[in-house]
Amino acid sequence: MAHTLLVAGTASHVGKSTVAAGLCRYLADCGVSVAPFKAQNMSNNARATPGGEVGVSQYVQARAAGVAPSTDHNPVLLKPRGDGESQLILDGDAVGHFEARGYYDEHWEDALETARAAHDRLAQSHDVIVAEGAGSIAEINLHDRDLANIETARFADADILLVADIERGGVFASLVGTLELVPDDIRKQVAGAVITKFRGDQSLLDPGIDAFEDRTGVPVLGVLPHDDPGLPEEDSVALPPVGERSVVGDDDAVPDAESVTVAVPRLPRISNFTDLQPLAHEPGVRVAYIPPDAALDDADAVVLPGSKNTVDDLRALTDAGFGDRLRSFDGPVVGLCGGYQMLGEAITNATIEGTGDADRVEGLGLLPVTTEFSESKTVEHVQRNIDGVGPLSGASGTVEGYEIHMGDSTLTGAAARPFDGDGAGTDTVLGTYLHDLFSNDTARDAFVRNTFESAGTVLPAATGRADGDPYERAAGLITDHVDLGPLGLSDQ
Protein backbone atom coordinates (compact mmCIF):
# COMPACT_ATOMS: atom_id res chain seq x y z
CA MET A 1 0.00 0.00 0.00
CA ALA A 2 1.28 3.46 -0.85
CA HIS A 3 2.64 5.84 1.76
CA THR A 4 0.49 8.99 1.78
CA LEU A 5 1.87 12.33 2.92
CA LEU A 6 -0.74 15.06 3.44
CA VAL A 7 0.61 18.59 2.95
CA ALA A 8 -1.81 20.56 5.14
CA GLY A 9 -1.81 24.24 5.95
CA THR A 10 -2.57 26.68 8.74
CA ALA A 11 -4.40 28.87 6.18
CA SER A 12 -4.95 29.43 2.47
CA HIS A 13 -2.07 30.60 0.28
CA VAL A 14 0.66 29.46 2.67
CA GLY A 15 2.56 27.47 0.01
CA LYS A 16 0.96 24.01 0.15
CA SER A 17 0.81 23.67 -3.63
CA THR A 18 4.45 24.62 -4.07
CA VAL A 19 5.61 22.22 -1.34
CA ALA A 20 3.53 19.41 -2.84
CA ALA A 21 4.85 20.05 -6.35
CA GLY A 22 8.42 20.20 -5.08
CA LEU A 23 7.99 16.90 -3.25
CA CYS A 24 6.50 15.28 -6.36
CA ARG A 25 9.42 16.35 -8.54
CA TYR A 26 12.05 15.45 -5.91
CA LEU A 27 10.63 11.94 -5.46
CA ALA A 28 10.27 11.43 -9.20
CA ASP A 29 13.91 12.47 -9.67
CA CYS A 30 14.82 9.84 -7.05
CA GLY A 31 13.06 7.15 -9.07
CA VAL A 32 10.09 6.87 -6.71
CA SER A 33 6.67 6.22 -8.25
CA VAL A 34 4.71 9.19 -6.93
CA ALA A 35 1.32 10.76 -7.64
CA PRO A 36 -0.41 13.92 -6.42
CA PHE A 37 -3.85 13.93 -4.84
CA LYS A 38 -6.33 16.49 -3.61
CA ALA A 39 -9.63 14.98 -2.56
CA GLN A 40 -11.59 18.21 -2.94
CA ASN A 41 -10.51 21.46 -4.51
CA MET A 42 -12.36 24.76 -4.77
CA SER A 43 -10.88 26.68 -7.68
CA ASN A 44 -11.85 28.27 -10.97
CA ASN A 45 -8.37 27.57 -12.33
CA ALA A 46 -8.97 24.17 -13.92
CA ARG A 47 -7.24 22.13 -16.60
CA ALA A 48 -8.55 19.55 -19.04
CA THR A 49 -7.55 15.89 -18.82
CA PRO A 50 -8.85 12.97 -20.91
CA GLY A 51 -11.34 12.22 -18.12
CA GLY A 52 -12.51 15.78 -17.49
CA GLU A 53 -11.56 18.76 -15.33
CA VAL A 54 -9.06 18.93 -12.48
CA GLY A 55 -7.65 21.81 -10.48
CA VAL A 56 -4.59 23.43 -12.01
CA SER A 57 -2.35 22.62 -9.03
CA GLN A 58 -2.96 18.87 -9.31
CA TYR A 59 -2.38 19.08 -13.06
CA VAL A 60 0.95 20.81 -12.39
CA GLN A 61 1.86 18.37 -9.60
CA ALA A 62 1.17 15.42 -11.90
CA ARG A 63 3.51 16.90 -14.48
CA ALA A 64 6.09 17.41 -11.74
CA ALA A 65 5.68 13.75 -10.75
CA GLY A 66 6.11 12.61 -14.34
CA VAL A 67 2.64 11.04 -14.61
CA ALA A 68 -0.26 11.83 -16.92
CA PRO A 69 -2.75 14.18 -15.21
CA SER A 70 -5.95 12.35 -14.30
CA THR A 71 -9.22 13.04 -12.53
CA ASP A 72 -8.02 10.61 -9.85
CA HIS A 73 -5.58 13.34 -8.82
CA ASN A 74 -8.50 15.70 -8.03
CA PRO A 75 -11.75 13.69 -7.93
CA VAL A 76 -13.94 16.46 -6.45
CA LEU A 77 -13.74 19.98 -7.87
CA LEU A 78 -15.94 22.91 -6.87
CA LYS A 79 -15.95 25.92 -9.21
CA PRO A 80 -17.57 29.02 -7.63
CA ARG A 81 -19.74 31.06 -9.97
CA GLY A 82 -20.96 33.71 -7.53
CA ASP A 83 -24.05 34.24 -5.37
CA GLY A 84 -23.03 31.38 -3.08
CA GLU A 85 -23.23 28.68 -5.76
CA SER A 86 -20.53 26.41 -7.13
CA GLN A 87 -20.45 23.95 -9.98
CA LEU A 88 -19.73 20.44 -8.69
CA ILE A 89 -17.36 18.30 -10.76
CA LEU A 90 -17.15 14.62 -9.74
CA ASP A 91 -14.56 12.45 -11.49
CA GLY A 92 -14.23 15.14 -14.15
CA ASP A 93 -17.94 15.42 -14.97
CA ALA A 94 -20.16 18.39 -14.17
CA VAL A 95 -23.00 17.35 -11.84
CA GLY A 96 -24.76 20.68 -11.32
CA HIS A 97 -24.72 23.95 -9.39
CA PHE A 98 -25.26 23.91 -5.63
CA GLU A 99 -25.13 26.14 -2.61
CA ALA A 100 -22.99 24.80 0.23
CA ARG A 101 -25.94 23.35 2.15
CA GLY A 102 -27.30 21.62 -0.93
CA TYR A 103 -23.91 20.10 -1.69
CA TYR A 104 -23.47 18.74 1.83
CA ASP A 105 -27.05 17.46 2.03
CA GLU A 106 -27.25 15.89 -1.43
CA HIS A 107 -23.74 15.00 -2.59
CA TRP A 108 -21.38 14.82 0.38
CA GLU A 109 -21.48 11.04 0.65
CA ASP A 110 -20.99 10.67 -3.11
CA ALA A 111 -18.03 13.03 -2.96
CA LEU A 112 -16.47 11.12 -0.06
CA GLU A 113 -16.79 7.77 -1.82
CA THR A 114 -15.50 9.26 -5.08
CA ALA A 115 -12.43 10.58 -3.28
CA ARG A 116 -11.82 7.30 -1.43
CA ALA A 117 -12.03 5.31 -4.64
CA ALA A 118 -9.66 7.66 -6.47
CA HIS A 119 -7.11 7.44 -3.66
CA ASP A 120 -7.38 3.65 -3.61
CA ARG A 121 -6.68 3.47 -7.34
CA LEU A 122 -3.62 5.69 -6.97
CA ALA A 123 -2.40 3.68 -3.98
CA GLN A 124 -2.46 0.49 -6.04
CA SER A 125 -0.18 1.89 -8.73
CA HIS A 126 2.24 4.20 -6.86
CA ASP A 127 4.65 4.02 -3.93
CA VAL A 128 3.97 7.50 -2.56
CA ILE A 129 0.96 9.79 -2.75
CA VAL A 130 1.57 13.47 -2.03
CA ALA A 131 -1.84 14.75 -0.99
CA GLU A 132 -2.59 18.45 -0.69
CA GLY A 133 -5.02 19.81 1.85
CA ALA A 134 -7.30 22.81 1.36
CA GLY A 135 -7.23 26.10 3.25
CA SER A 136 -6.68 25.44 6.95
CA ILE A 137 -6.83 22.00 8.53
CA ALA A 138 -8.13 23.68 11.71
CA GLU A 139 -11.54 24.85 10.45
CA ILE A 140 -13.41 23.43 13.45
CA ASN A 141 -16.82 24.26 11.97
CA LEU A 142 -16.06 21.87 9.09
CA HIS A 143 -14.27 18.98 10.81
CA ASP A 144 -17.22 16.64 10.31
CA ARG A 145 -17.11 17.19 6.53
CA ASP A 146 -13.57 18.35 5.72
CA LEU A 147 -12.84 16.12 2.76
CA ALA A 148 -9.49 17.55 1.67
CA ASN A 149 -7.95 17.60 5.15
CA ILE A 150 -9.53 15.56 7.97
CA GLU A 151 -11.18 12.84 5.88
CA THR A 152 -8.13 12.43 3.66
CA ALA A 153 -5.84 12.11 6.68
CA ARG A 154 -8.09 9.40 8.07
CA PHE A 155 -8.94 7.26 5.06
CA ALA A 156 -5.36 7.47 3.73
CA ASP A 157 -3.74 6.98 7.17
CA ALA A 158 -1.50 9.84 6.10
CA ASP A 159 1.49 11.41 7.75
CA ILE A 160 0.86 15.15 7.90
CA LEU A 161 3.31 17.92 7.03
CA LEU A 162 1.95 21.20 8.39
CA VAL A 163 2.80 24.31 6.35
CA ALA A 164 2.71 27.85 7.76
CA ASP A 165 3.50 31.20 6.10
CA ILE A 166 5.71 33.59 8.08
CA GLU A 167 5.13 36.51 5.70
CA ARG A 168 1.72 37.32 7.19
CA GLY A 169 3.08 37.37 10.75
CA GLY A 170 2.15 35.23 13.74
CA VAL A 171 3.59 32.04 12.31
CA PHE A 172 4.10 30.32 15.67
CA ALA A 173 0.65 31.30 16.90
CA SER A 174 -0.76 29.84 13.67
CA LEU A 175 1.13 26.59 14.13
CA VAL A 176 0.33 26.17 17.82
CA GLY A 177 -3.30 27.19 17.35
CA THR A 178 -3.73 24.74 14.49
CA LEU A 179 -2.33 21.87 16.54
CA GLU A 180 -4.61 22.80 19.45
CA LEU A 181 -7.72 22.80 17.26
CA VAL A 182 -7.35 19.65 15.15
CA PRO A 183 -8.94 16.42 16.46
CA ASP A 184 -6.72 14.31 18.71
CA ASP A 185 -6.29 11.50 16.19
CA ILE A 186 -5.24 13.97 13.50
CA ARG A 187 -2.82 15.68 15.87
CA LYS A 188 -1.01 12.36 16.34
CA GLN A 189 -0.49 12.07 12.58
CA VAL A 190 1.43 15.37 12.31
CA ALA A 191 5.01 14.38 11.51
CA GLY A 192 6.50 17.84 11.16
CA ALA A 193 6.08 21.44 10.11
CA VAL A 194 7.54 23.69 7.43
CA ILE A 195 7.71 27.48 7.54
CA THR A 196 7.50 29.23 4.15
CA LYS A 197 8.24 32.66 2.64
CA PHE A 198 11.03 33.57 5.05
CA ARG A 199 13.27 36.58 4.43
CA GLY A 200 16.41 37.51 6.33
CA ASP A 201 18.68 35.87 8.88
CA GLN A 202 17.29 32.49 9.95
CA SER A 203 19.29 32.53 13.18
CA LEU A 204 16.84 35.17 14.41
CA LEU A 205 14.04 32.64 13.90
CA ASP A 206 15.73 29.74 15.67
CA PRO A 207 14.67 30.67 19.24
CA GLY A 208 11.04 30.63 18.13
CA ILE A 209 11.51 27.25 16.47
CA ASP A 210 13.09 25.84 19.63
CA ALA A 211 10.22 27.14 21.78
CA PHE A 212 7.62 25.74 19.37
CA GLU A 213 9.23 22.30 19.32
CA ASP A 214 9.55 22.24 23.12
CA ARG A 215 5.89 23.19 23.50
CA THR A 216 4.38 20.83 20.92
CA GLY A 217 6.89 18.06 20.30
CA VAL A 218 6.46 18.64 16.55
CA PRO A 219 9.74 19.21 14.71
CA VAL A 220 10.17 22.08 12.26
CA LEU A 221 11.66 20.24 9.32
CA GLY A 222 12.50 23.25 7.21
CA VAL A 223 12.33 26.97 6.58
CA LEU A 224 11.76 27.87 2.94
CA PRO A 225 12.99 31.23 1.64
CA HIS A 226 10.68 33.67 -0.10
CA ASP A 227 11.40 32.33 -3.59
CA ASP A 228 8.56 31.88 -6.06
CA PRO A 229 9.43 29.05 -8.46
CA GLY A 230 6.85 30.31 -10.95
CA LEU A 231 4.21 27.59 -10.68
CA PRO A 232 0.63 28.49 -11.66
CA GLU A 233 -1.51 29.93 -8.87
CA GLU A 234 -4.39 27.77 -7.70
CA ASP A 235 -7.08 30.34 -6.89
CA SER A 236 -7.97 34.01 -6.77
CA VAL A 237 -6.59 34.43 -3.24
CA ALA A 238 -3.38 35.28 -5.11
CA LEU A 239 -5.08 38.21 -6.86
CA PRO A 240 -6.10 41.61 -5.51
CA PRO A 241 -9.71 42.00 -4.35
CA VAL A 242 -12.19 43.29 -6.91
CA GLY A 243 -11.83 47.06 -7.01
CA GLU A 244 -8.09 47.12 -6.28
CA ARG A 245 -5.14 47.29 -8.66
CA SER A 246 -2.13 45.00 -8.51
CA VAL A 247 0.88 44.57 -10.77
CA VAL A 248 2.87 41.38 -11.34
CA GLY A 249 5.89 40.83 -13.52
CA ASP A 250 8.48 43.48 -14.34
CA ASP A 251 7.18 45.98 -11.78
CA ASP A 252 10.41 47.15 -10.17
CA ALA A 253 10.57 50.28 -12.31
CA VAL A 254 8.13 52.90 -13.48
CA PRO A 255 7.01 52.60 -17.13
CA ASP A 256 9.92 53.52 -19.38
CA ALA A 257 11.17 53.14 -22.93
CA GLU A 258 11.71 49.39 -22.48
CA SER A 259 8.51 48.33 -20.74
CA VAL A 260 4.83 47.80 -21.50
CA THR A 261 1.74 47.27 -19.36
CA VAL A 262 -0.83 44.58 -20.13
CA ALA A 263 -4.08 45.51 -18.39
CA VAL A 264 -6.36 42.69 -17.20
CA PRO A 265 -9.78 43.58 -15.76
CA ARG A 266 -10.14 41.93 -12.36
CA LEU A 267 -13.44 40.20 -13.02
CA PRO A 268 -15.52 39.33 -9.94
CA ARG A 269 -15.65 35.68 -11.08
CA ILE A 270 -12.30 35.47 -12.85
CA SER A 271 -11.06 32.00 -13.82
CA ASN A 272 -7.93 30.50 -15.35
CA PHE A 273 -5.94 33.66 -14.75
CA THR A 274 -2.90 31.39 -14.93
CA ASP A 275 -3.17 32.11 -18.67
CA LEU A 276 -1.48 35.45 -17.90
CA GLN A 277 1.46 34.15 -15.88
CA PRO A 278 3.76 33.47 -18.87
CA LEU A 279 3.44 37.13 -19.87
CA ALA A 280 4.44 38.29 -16.39
CA HIS A 281 7.76 36.43 -16.78
CA GLU A 282 8.67 38.30 -19.97
CA PRO A 283 11.34 41.02 -19.60
CA GLY A 284 9.79 44.47 -19.71
CA VAL A 285 6.21 43.22 -19.36
CA ARG A 286 3.99 44.14 -16.41
CA VAL A 287 0.59 42.47 -16.02
CA ALA A 288 -1.71 44.88 -14.18
CA TYR A 289 -4.97 43.57 -12.71
CA ILE A 290 -7.25 46.60 -12.72
CA PRO A 291 -10.75 47.31 -11.36
CA PRO A 292 -13.53 47.21 -13.99
CA ASP A 293 -14.03 50.97 -13.60
CA ALA A 294 -10.34 51.83 -14.09
CA ALA A 295 -9.05 53.97 -16.94
CA LEU A 296 -6.88 52.43 -19.65
CA ASP A 297 -4.60 55.45 -20.00
CA ASP A 298 -1.40 53.62 -19.02
CA ALA A 299 -2.31 50.31 -20.71
CA ASP A 300 -0.41 49.21 -23.81
CA ALA A 301 -2.52 46.07 -24.33
CA VAL A 302 -5.63 44.55 -22.76
CA VAL A 303 -6.37 40.88 -22.10
CA LEU A 304 -9.87 39.81 -21.03
CA PRO A 305 -9.43 36.61 -19.01
CA GLY A 306 -11.74 33.65 -18.50
CA SER A 307 -14.75 33.75 -16.21
CA LYS A 308 -16.80 31.19 -14.31
CA ASN A 309 -19.84 33.34 -15.01
CA THR A 310 -19.31 35.15 -18.29
CA VAL A 311 -22.76 36.73 -18.33
CA ASP A 312 -22.57 38.31 -14.88
CA ASP A 313 -18.98 39.44 -15.36
CA LEU A 314 -19.95 40.98 -18.71
CA ARG A 315 -22.69 42.90 -16.92
CA ALA A 316 -20.13 44.06 -14.33
CA LEU A 317 -17.87 45.41 -17.07
CA THR A 318 -20.74 47.09 -18.89
CA ASP A 319 -22.11 48.69 -15.73
CA ALA A 320 -18.63 50.05 -14.96
CA GLY A 321 -18.32 51.63 -18.42
CA PHE A 322 -15.43 49.34 -19.35
CA GLY A 323 -16.85 48.60 -22.78
CA ASP A 324 -16.84 52.27 -23.78
CA ARG A 325 -13.22 52.66 -22.71
CA LEU A 326 -12.19 49.45 -24.45
CA ARG A 327 -13.83 50.47 -27.73
CA SER A 328 -11.81 53.69 -27.62
CA PHE A 329 -8.58 51.84 -26.88
CA ASP A 330 -6.24 51.54 -29.87
CA GLY A 331 -3.76 48.93 -28.62
CA PRO A 332 -3.87 45.12 -28.94
CA VAL A 333 -6.85 43.40 -27.28
CA VAL A 334 -7.10 39.64 -26.63
CA GLY A 335 -10.04 37.73 -25.15
CA LEU A 336 -9.52 34.24 -23.73
CA CYS A 337 -12.50 31.87 -23.43
CA GLY A 338 -15.09 33.87 -21.45
CA GLY A 339 -13.21 37.02 -22.44
CA TYR A 340 -13.64 36.01 -26.08
CA GLN A 341 -17.37 35.59 -25.57
CA MET A 342 -17.58 39.04 -23.95
CA LEU A 343 -15.82 40.68 -26.92
CA GLY A 344 -18.62 39.56 -29.26
CA GLU A 345 -21.88 41.23 -30.16
CA ALA A 346 -24.21 39.24 -27.93
CA ILE A 347 -24.73 36.16 -25.76
CA THR A 348 -27.98 34.21 -26.07
CA ASN A 349 -29.50 31.62 -23.75
CA ALA A 350 -27.78 33.74 -21.12
CA THR A 351 -29.91 32.42 -18.25
CA ILE A 352 -28.10 29.06 -18.48
CA GLU A 353 -25.02 30.63 -16.93
CA GLY A 354 -26.02 34.06 -15.65
CA THR A 355 -28.10 34.84 -12.59
CA GLY A 356 -30.38 37.38 -14.29
CA ASP A 357 -33.63 36.93 -16.22
CA ALA A 358 -32.53 38.25 -19.62
CA ASP A 359 -32.14 35.58 -22.30
CA ARG A 360 -29.96 37.86 -24.46
CA VAL A 361 -27.12 40.04 -23.18
CA GLU A 362 -25.30 42.53 -25.38
CA GLY A 363 -21.55 42.02 -25.70
CA LEU A 364 -18.75 44.57 -25.84
CA GLY A 365 -19.03 44.62 -29.63
CA LEU A 366 -15.37 44.41 -30.63
CA LEU A 367 -15.68 41.16 -32.62
CA PRO A 368 -18.39 40.06 -35.11
CA VAL A 369 -19.33 37.04 -32.99
CA THR A 370 -22.42 35.81 -31.17
CA THR A 371 -22.33 33.12 -28.50
CA GLU A 372 -25.16 30.72 -27.68
CA PHE A 373 -25.03 28.94 -24.35
CA SER A 374 -26.18 25.36 -23.87
CA GLU A 375 -26.07 22.85 -21.03
CA SER A 376 -23.27 20.84 -22.67
CA LYS A 377 -19.68 21.60 -21.72
CA THR A 378 -16.52 21.31 -23.79
CA VAL A 379 -13.51 19.94 -21.89
CA GLU A 380 -10.54 18.91 -24.02
CA HIS A 381 -6.84 19.28 -24.67
CA VAL A 382 -6.24 20.66 -28.16
CA GLN A 383 -3.44 21.20 -30.65
CA ARG A 384 -3.99 23.64 -33.47
CA ASN A 385 -2.20 25.37 -36.30
CA ILE A 386 -1.94 29.11 -35.77
CA ASP A 387 -2.21 31.75 -38.48
CA GLY A 388 -1.41 34.84 -36.48
CA VAL A 389 -3.50 37.94 -37.08
CA GLY A 390 -3.88 41.23 -35.24
CA PRO A 391 -2.31 41.00 -31.76
CA LEU A 392 -0.70 37.67 -32.74
CA SER A 393 0.49 38.80 -36.17
CA GLY A 394 3.64 36.91 -37.09
CA ALA A 395 2.85 33.80 -35.04
CA SER A 396 2.89 30.53 -36.98
CA GLY A 397 3.23 26.80 -36.57
CA THR A 398 1.42 24.72 -33.95
CA VAL A 399 0.11 25.70 -30.54
CA GLU A 400 -1.21 23.57 -27.67
CA GLY A 401 -3.70 24.36 -24.96
CA TYR A 402 -7.05 23.32 -23.60
CA GLU A 403 -10.70 24.29 -23.80
CA ILE A 404 -13.13 24.38 -20.87
CA HIS A 405 -16.31 26.24 -21.73
CA MET A 406 -20.05 26.22 -22.17
CA GLY A 407 -21.49 27.79 -25.30
CA ASP A 408 -20.44 28.02 -28.95
CA SER A 409 -19.50 31.18 -30.83
CA THR A 410 -20.46 31.92 -34.43
CA LEU A 411 -19.02 34.54 -36.78
CA THR A 412 -21.58 37.11 -37.92
CA GLY A 413 -19.26 39.24 -40.08
CA ALA A 414 -15.80 39.53 -41.58
CA ALA A 415 -13.03 38.26 -39.32
CA ALA A 416 -10.10 35.87 -39.58
CA ARG A 417 -10.07 32.43 -37.96
CA PRO A 418 -6.61 32.23 -36.40
CA PHE A 419 -6.74 28.69 -34.98
CA ASP A 420 -8.04 26.05 -37.42
CA GLY A 421 -11.60 27.35 -37.26
CA ASP A 422 -11.46 28.56 -33.66
CA GLY A 423 -11.52 32.17 -32.60
CA ALA A 424 -11.88 35.44 -34.44
CA GLY A 425 -9.41 38.20 -35.23
CA THR A 426 -9.25 41.70 -36.68
CA ASP A 427 -6.36 44.15 -37.02
CA THR A 428 -6.22 44.88 -33.28
CA VAL A 429 -8.58 42.42 -31.56
CA LEU A 430 -8.39 38.63 -31.20
CA GLY A 431 -10.52 36.13 -29.31
CA THR A 432 -10.08 32.40 -28.77
CA TYR A 433 -11.32 29.54 -26.59
CA LEU A 434 -7.73 28.33 -26.23
CA HIS A 435 -6.48 28.46 -22.65
CA ASP A 436 -2.72 28.38 -22.04
CA LEU A 437 -2.17 30.27 -25.30
CA PHE A 438 0.73 32.33 -23.98
CA SER A 439 2.63 29.26 -22.82
CA ASN A 440 3.36 28.73 -26.52
CA ASP A 441 6.50 30.62 -27.52
CA THR A 442 5.25 31.60 -30.96
CA ALA A 443 2.03 33.17 -29.62
CA ARG A 444 3.64 34.84 -26.60
CA ASP A 445 6.58 36.23 -28.58
CA ALA A 446 4.25 37.63 -31.25
CA PHE A 447 1.94 39.25 -28.70
CA VAL A 448 4.83 40.82 -26.78
CA ARG A 449 6.52 42.08 -29.94
CA ASN A 450 3.28 43.54 -31.33
CA THR A 451 2.49 45.19 -27.99
CA PHE A 452 5.90 46.88 -27.88
CA GLU A 453 5.54 48.00 -31.50
CA SER A 454 2.04 49.36 -30.91
CA ALA A 455 3.24 51.25 -27.83
CA GLY A 456 6.26 52.67 -29.68
CA THR A 457 8.63 51.33 -27.03
CA VAL A 458 11.88 49.43 -27.39
CA LEU A 459 11.73 45.65 -27.09
CA PRO A 460 14.32 44.54 -24.48
CA ALA A 461 17.28 42.68 -25.89
CA ALA A 462 16.66 39.77 -23.51
CA THR A 463 13.47 37.88 -24.26
CA GLY A 464 11.93 34.73 -22.86
CA ARG A 465 11.88 33.22 -19.42
CA ALA A 466 15.28 33.09 -17.78
CA ASP A 467 14.54 31.77 -14.31
CA GLY A 468 14.74 28.03 -14.97
CA ASP A 469 12.40 25.05 -14.85
CA PRO A 470 9.72 25.81 -12.22
CA TYR A 471 9.42 22.12 -11.29
CA GLU A 472 13.13 21.84 -10.58
CA ARG A 473 13.09 25.14 -8.70
CA ALA A 474 10.25 23.84 -6.51
CA ALA A 475 12.17 20.60 -5.93
CA GLY A 476 15.25 22.63 -5.05
CA LEU A 477 13.35 24.43 -2.31
CA ILE A 478 12.64 21.03 -0.76
CA THR A 479 16.06 19.43 -1.14
CA ASP A 480 17.93 22.55 -0.01
CA HIS A 481 15.78 23.51 2.95
CA VAL A 482 13.73 20.55 4.27
CA ASP A 483 14.83 17.54 6.33
CA LEU A 484 12.81 14.73 4.75
CA GLY A 485 14.12 11.99 7.05
CA PRO A 486 11.29 12.08 9.64
CA LEU A 487 8.71 11.76 6.84
CA GLY A 488 9.91 8.29 5.86
CA LEU A 489 9.97 9.12 2.17
CA SER A 490 13.51 7.84 1.71
CA ASP A 491 12.32 4.34 2.62
CA GLN A 492 10.21 4.01 -0.52
Swiss-Prot record:
InterPro entries linked to this entry: Class_I_gatase-like (IPR029062), CobQ/CobB/MinD/ParA_Nub-bd_dom (IPR002586), CobQ_GATase1 (IPR033949), CobQ_N (IPR047045), CobQ_synth (IPR004459), GATase_3 (IPR011698), P-loop_NTPase (IPR027417)
Pfam families: CbiA, GATase_3
Domain GATase cobBQ-type: 259-443
Family matches, as Gene3D superfamilies: 3.40.50.880, P-loop containing nucleotide triphosphate hydrolases
Domain of life: Archaea
GO annotation, biological process: cobalamin biosynthetic process
Pathway named in the protein's UniProt entry: Cofactor biosynthesis; adenosylcobalamin biosynthesis
Function: Catalyzes amidations at positions B, D, E, and G on adenosylcobyrinic A,C-diamide. NH(2) groups are provided by glutamine, and one molecule of ATP is hydrogenolyzed for each amidation.
Protein name in UniProt: Probable cobyric acid synthase
Gene expressing this chain: cobQ
